[in-house]
Amino acid sequence: MIITKSWLNDWLELEEISSDKIAKTLNSIGIEVDRVGALKAPDKVVVGYVKEKIKHENSDKLSICQVDIGSETLQIVCGAANVDAGQFVAVATKGAIMPNGMEIKEAKLRGVDSCGMLCSSLELGFEKINEGIMLLDESIGKLELGRPLNTYEIFNDELIEVELTPNRGDCLSIYGIARDLAAALNLNLKEPKPFKESENVLGIGRILRLAAEKELNGLYNYRAIGLKEEIQTNLLLSLRLAQIEGLGKNSIENLLNYATHSTGVLFNAYDLSSFSEKDEEFIINLSKQVHGETKVSYKDKLLSFSGIFQNNESRCKDDSKIIIIEANYTDPLVIADAKIYHKDQDEKMLYRSFRGSEPKLNLGMDFLLGIFEHIPNLVIYSSSQQILTDKELPIIPISIEGISDIIGQNVDKDEVLKILKKLGFELILSGEGLINVKAPLHRPDIKNLSDICEEVVRIIGIDNIASKGLEFIEKNRLNSAYKNYIEFLNLRKRAVASGYFESLHYVLDNGEELKRLGFDSVKLKLINPITAELNTLRTTLLNHLLNAASLNAKNSKKIIKLFELGAVFNVNNQELNRIAFIHSGLKEEAKISNKAKPESVQFYDFLLDIKNIIGDFKLKSSKYNILSPYEQADIYLSDIKVGFIGRLHLKIENERDLPKTYICELDLDLIRQDFKIAKPYSKFPAITRDLSVLIPKGFEYNQIKNCIEELNLEILENFRLVDIYSDENLKEFYSITISFSFRDINKTLEDNQVNECMDKILNTLKNLGLDLR
């Protein structure tokens, strides 16, 4: 969105306010300024008058002009095709430095002296407005010969480009920007004077009638204009339109574009003569379409869809004699819903209507007619035809205390009311300190108290709000369902990190397969199972995982690592949460380190994976028919059995066509991850000792472990089994080696402290009937 200071001056008194302050103010109220740049004609460029023009004898394209600049008459050779006697022009005199760096000097062109240059707008550093030189007129101010061009406001201006968010369609006009600036700078907004109807002219009812359906989603205002000759766009409008890339060849379209950019009101101009016969009444039909948009038509001929596009055949031409001017507004929500159903679209029109154009149609029409009335040989038909549907605006109750609470500091009631009034809000004071607020139609984004607070803060300035810590008072929203979700999510992440892929299966299973695996069936049977294979609720996750692993093995997968987390049911139909794992086949892929001969998965590998997923646990002997009698165990956490682990029985491996396979199933409700309390790390070195102990075959290491833990030796950091050895000489015994690590957190240990602990450990082992090797 491009604005200039001089254009803003049409709506606000900004002569005493610098462009820098305007830019800072715009930024502070949420209208982001992209750039600020000067638009100034060079020095020594003055107003001149072409007194005489003759052809150059030695050139077909050059003319010799006598140009009066007040103090003298200059002879200037000019190559512009549009130069002629009787014109006011911009004259660059000797010594002028042009924007491209060229210095104007006296010169001879084809043997004729030339003492200056007649300039185009492009040569002066402005946008191009026409072919040839720029012709001056009094739209820029009174023309005085010899007056420096940069003393005219339009030629000594500053351009401001702003970036608008999609919800600020109300600022897509000079009037909209000025409205916000008026509130921020406490200025009065200039409104266009209501158009004064001329006497002794025909009324619009003679040539135009509206036929409209009820409940249209829009507002409409029509005026008629009679043209006796083609009109021209004056210099001021041309320069401003060129700055916003809105200058076209059709003068009527140019005036509409100018009025739209100035006021924000959308306009269409229809050529009456191209549709209706002479002396025929022009009846405009307005009908609401399926998606809420309004179709504007004459008989069976489409004129436009409001806010979406205008039919090119209905547009006014250079030779149009009677034109109908339409100012319209359509609810932006309707445009958003309807635009996708129209192949033909006017992007510039949609850009405004989709964000919300200015609904003050009379303001826009008065502004446009104020331009038309200064154009000669033109008749403005009296009166207008309007369709103004009353849209009930929502009422937002507010209080100054509520606004102060949200903002974080007390705000003055009068200041709040003044800000809201300047922004166009309707205020209705009620009892008990409440104020009912109606947001203006041009601000459809204002929905609640928070939006109103944002408007107040925007105008006051966020920098003027004192910083204050926010107090968040909120009850704990962490319930058991959320905690379960986080717990299960973390388990899934750790399983995936260990190389396992998650499987998902139906909660139904094959009862016969479960029975063969040794699992009980639920008491209640399914009356109408979806398939014969899924005829009961599952009591384990393992059967589905075994079937999935078997399918993968048949598809030549060498490493099969799967897990599933889900619900199972006990024999009493109670739902339980379980997680199960399966690792079948090879331990790793073939690679250089294993000489392309990877080993099959081992029990220890599988145990290590489970430890990485659920943490430390203990193993105790078990007896499950589904598992190998030589490689199986129950898993305990804090002396509570939470599941089992082991190798799948060889018979079942063969039945399912599986390679070496290990499985594990755990009760999710029993493996909660408690918060670990961090302890300080000792800076002092550890002392290690090893013991080799003879134990009978079949003796459980857990007995040794439990007895040592019961000693509660303060300096014993950890101990672990590091070796198991047997040979013929040991007969019915194993030799196991246990490594002990001792450390004090406060000091370096002495040997006698460690020896004392080792003696206690040896006595404990003797009490178990064990001897050193």
From Swiss-Prot:
Transmembrane segments: none annotated. GO terms for cellular component: phenylalanine-tRNA ligase complex. Binds 2 magnesium ions per tetramer. The keyword 4Fe-4S does not apply. Belongs to the phenylalanyl-tRNA synthetase beta subunit family. Type 1 subfamily. PANTHER family: PHENYLALANINE--TRNA LIGASE BETA SUBUNIT, PHENYLALANYL-TRNA SYNTHETASE BETA CHAIN AND LEUCINE-RICH REPEAT-CONTAINING PROTEIN 47. NCBIfam families: pheT_bact (TIGR00472), YtpR (NF045760). This is Phenylalanine--tRNA ligase beta subunit. It comes from Campylobacter jejuni (strain RM1221).
